[in-house]
């Protein structure tokens, strides 16, 4: 395939056009008065969103050179989304500003490599300033609520729900977002350990209204193979019946004959019992059974350990305060496991999480960790229409990521003020030469841009408000929602420090690459020749046929 090559100014100008096309589409969403973007979908209703990265991912331009520029900025948005989960629009605005001002200087004769060095030095200084401004969240859940509210575009209800979910599952818990069946947005928290396996037979149900099997203070038998004959279970069943306590069997499967005997005894009332299949598959199943054993103070009866079912004793059984089994899930509340053993197991899972490179494995380990340590919360997002539900789900996802980022690295004043306060750190900073100093000035100008854009989206004049915020100190800034100047931290306008940091680092990284580009190569579109017109004498059919 033939290639088309552009050099120098021609190349950079075309790339810049692509950058502006994408950034202008994304930046209208910034701030509390940012607008929505409607994205056409090939099937179904159009997608309405205020999420920067969702908008960025949809942009594809026809000119290959312009499209490359757009893809570079798309990389800024998606990298920021991967690392911090939010701040994608801010990162895009910063990248556009650094590229725009940087390009003017390169055109005027500045050395791109020196400019990049100056930009990198300035960014390091701003990152340091952001870290100094950050305040730890700790157990202050009102801060989490504020962060979630700001990320969800000022939606107080979402802020409250996320704060409630965080409070109940703690930092190690898992929070997932799902679409609700109705119009209400609710949070559902599962205390204790839950896994996605229900009863093997509905005849084990104790509460016929809810179709659940509820067991108080039960014994728990954990076996990693199939139970084929009932006589293997007798050493456990007889003492259990004498104790009068219920028994939960977790096994790979139970043979139909053994299951029928258990069900008959359960219906006669001589045996309080329930059986469920083991969760997970393969090695993950072994790990999850071990988790359940540690949590309940039991032992996994496994031939790998030299243990057989017929030789099982009551010491090998786990116990818990309460177990609820429905057709899809089993929930174990307050397992009687040793606290130190549980902590050791949690530590082990954390080490595995650090060592794994697969995102899928990391997610599954995080789920196991949550079940051991905190709990699992599900946020059900409801809305009157599907289009609104998708838009709301985007905002909830953003808010959730932002709150996690806030817990990691603390919070800074929102509304672009953290960047404005970082300008002081760059005052009087000089590079090794004139072009490096220009690079520092470029960053100094660029970090005003998020505030300018928030103000522009609110319909005000950016320069005037930026100047007034610069004259203030500390948390003093412009609250675009209320259209007033106030202490932003007290007003609850706060951003996660991690999001603020990652947005600038990614924007500067891609902008630096952009400015040091001298040649761009794209595939040349081949002109496909038009089909020749058909000869009128070449009609179908055979001559003389009627």
From Swiss-Prot:
Which cellular component terms (GO) are annotated to the entry?
cytoplasm
| Binding site residues for ATP | 29-32, 50, 86-90, 415, 495
Q: Which UniProt keywords apply?
A: ATP-binding, Chaperone, Cytoplasm, Isomerase, Nucleotide-binding
Q: Name one GO molecular function term.
A: ATP-dependent protein folding chaperone
Q: What reaction does this enzyme carry out catalytically?
A: ATP + H2O + a folded polypeptide = ADP + phosphate + an unfolded polypeptide
Domain of life where this protein originates = Bacteria
- Subcellular localization: Cytoplasm
Q: Which PROSITE patterns match?
A: CHAPERONINS_CPN60
UniProt cross-references to Pfam families, sorted A to Z: Cpn60_TCP1
| Single biological process term from Gene Ontology | protein refolding
Reported EC number(s) for this entry are 5.6.1.7
Subunit record text: Forms a cylinder of 14 subunits composed of two heptameric rings stacked back-to-back. Interacts with the co-chaperonin GroES.
- Tell me its family: Belongs to the chaperonin (HSP60) family.
Record's function text: Together with its co-chaperonin GroES, plays an essential role in assisting protein folding. The GroEL-GroES system forms a nano-cage that allows encapsulation of the non-native substrate proteins and provides a physical environment optimized to promote and accelerate protein folding.
Name by which UniProt lists this protein: Chaperonin GroEL
Q: Which organism is it from?
A: Parabacteroides distasonis (strain ATCC 8503 / DSM 20701 / CIP 104284 / JCM 5825 / NCTC 11152)
* Gene name in the database record: groEL
